[in-house]
Amino acid sequence: MVYFKTLLDGNSSLGEILAHRYETWSSRMVIEAVLIPLVHCPLLWKILDIVIFTSLPVLLCGLLGVTGRGRWFVTGLVLLYPFADMASAGWIATTTNYLWPLWGVLVIGMVLKQLRCGRKVPVWEAAAAFLACAYAGSQEQAAVLLLLLLGMEVLHYISEKRMKQPLLYALCGIDIISLIYIFSCPGNAIRSAQEMAGRMPEFADFTFAEKLYMGLANVE
């Protein structure tokens, strides 16, 4: 987090910093466009993070249709998460890179549920879904998760012959653009090579199945 705090201390603008990060380290420009200013305003981050974390069980209950005492169960499950893990790379950096994209995926899930139920999505909710998709899609794992989620929704409406879903297609477009951006980012390739050389040089020789297993397994 100290690193991000020093980025705006020089003469470079936020746009120049993000462009440099894109070329040399990361494609998470939407996330970092939020992260870097928030590092200089920790009070605002605290307010936003509290709102996001406390709304997680609300979103989960809404998605799963949980009511009554079941809401307390879902809330308890959320509270079981060892939140100290969010300090691994600094509180602001870790939450904005991992917790907030998860929240964005849940927001999109709620909007998709409304579409499934045939309800009209208000303009402000559609706008929130677009912002959530752009933000969550900036994080690699969340972008892939959204692709699967949105893809399944498209197949569902195709099977039901309900093809007029402009909001869904717009979300798909945002996520696909995000994925193209991720895969074409030179900084991601540079970071991957540096991390591999410094942490696990033999990783390049692993099979796809071995890499997939390592990605899914707990390697603590």
What are these regions (language model features)?
Residues 1-44, 52, 92, 133, ...:
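Transmembrane catalytic cores of multi-pass membrane glycosyltransferases
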Residues 24, 28, 71, 75-113:
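Membrane-interface micro-motifs in multi-pass membrane enzymes
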Residues 47-72, 107:
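Transmembrane-helix motifs of polytopic, lipid-linked glycan transferases
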Residues 49, 53, 97-108, 145-153:
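Hydrophobic core segments of transmembrane alpha-helices in multi-pass, intramembrane catalytic enzymes
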Residues 59-67, 81-84, 108-118, 151-163:
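Structural signal for the C-terminal ends of transmembrane alpha-helices
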Residues 71-78, 125-132, 169-175:
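Central hydrophobic cores of alpha-helical transmembrane segments
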Residues 114-134, 163-169:
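Short hydrophobic alpha-helices at membrane interfaces in multi-pass membrane enzymes
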